């Protein structure tokens, strides 16, 4: 687990992308570069020169388009979890929040997974999937973004 590499996409509302990028840049003591484009990207380098992004996510229901926010992390490792936690706490204290339309995506490096380990993981998730959906109370209209394994 401690050597596993992963990336996270965290959707949120409550602050603008500009404000979110400023919070991330201030956290790392850097600035941000506005990339623009369809996702209206703002790129922020951390002390390890990795790029964190604040982008637009049109699937998010927000008061204003500029509040459809998603934080995209660079590739992280276990030792980065405390940094991520502190950054998210800072963002929350400054107004970032989630609503029913916000999601979280975790991408895991599959390099060290054997074919059997992948089968085991999918089987485990599949066998507990209904419990997860019920526990999370996922609304039916959100299912297009969060489909079940067998759908």
What are these regions (language model features)?
Residues 1-151:
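Phosphate/nucleotide-binding catalytic core
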């Amino acid at each position: 687990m401690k050597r596993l590499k992963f990336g996270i996409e965290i959707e949120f509302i409550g602050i603008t992308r500009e404000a979110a990028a400023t919070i991330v840049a201030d956290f790392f003591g850097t600035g941000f570069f506005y990339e623009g484009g369809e996702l209206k990207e703002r790129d922020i380098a951390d002390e390890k020169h990795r790029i964190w992004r604040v982008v637009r996510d049109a699937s998010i229901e927000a008061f204003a388009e500029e509040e459809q926010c998603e934080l995209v992390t660079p590739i992280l490792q276990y030792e980065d979890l405390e940094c991520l936690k502190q950054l998210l706490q800072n963002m929350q204290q400054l107004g970032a929040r989630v609503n029913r339309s916000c999601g979280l995506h975790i991408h895991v490096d599959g390099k060290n997974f054997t074919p059997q380990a992948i089968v085991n993981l999918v089987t485990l998730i599949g066998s507990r999937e209904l419990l997860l959906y019920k526990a999370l109370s996922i609304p039916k209209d959100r299912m297009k973004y969060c489909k079940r394994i067998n759908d």
